[in-house]
Amino acid sequence: MFIITGKKFTTLGNQIFEFMSGLYPNLTEVDIEVIPTDLTEDNVFGWTLENNDQNEIEIHNELSQKDFITTLIHELIHVDQNVRGLRDDTQRENEAYSLEHTLTNQFLNKC
């Protein structure tokens, strides 16, 4: 199940999830909740917290549309990594950063 608690990018978030689940079927195996929140003090655009088969993505609530797309894609890659059991932080970030812009462009070209 995929849920976005904020209204600003609900439709866009669902479109991103559909796009990413086509590439990463593992995303449909777990519950994912996206929570827009003020992450200014944390100096990040988003992060993913895992609890068993439930993943919570906190995403900064004042992102531009493009930054929202890139950040949600990045965090959904982390959810897939959680399902695959990839725990090494360096490998996780290298993979997510190496794919986020390519996948963002693919998503934008589909819209």
Label each region the model flagged:
Residues 1-4:
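Acidic/histidine-rich, surface-exposed loop or edge segments in extracytoplasmic proteins
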Residues 7-29:
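Zn2+-dependent metallopeptidase catalytic core
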Residues 53-72, 86-88:
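Short pre-active-site segment immediately N-terminal to the catalytic Zn-binding motif
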Residues 71, 75-79, 83:
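Catalytic glutamate of the conserved HExxH
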Residues 88-111:
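Post-HExxH zinc-binding segment in Zn-dependent metallohydrolases
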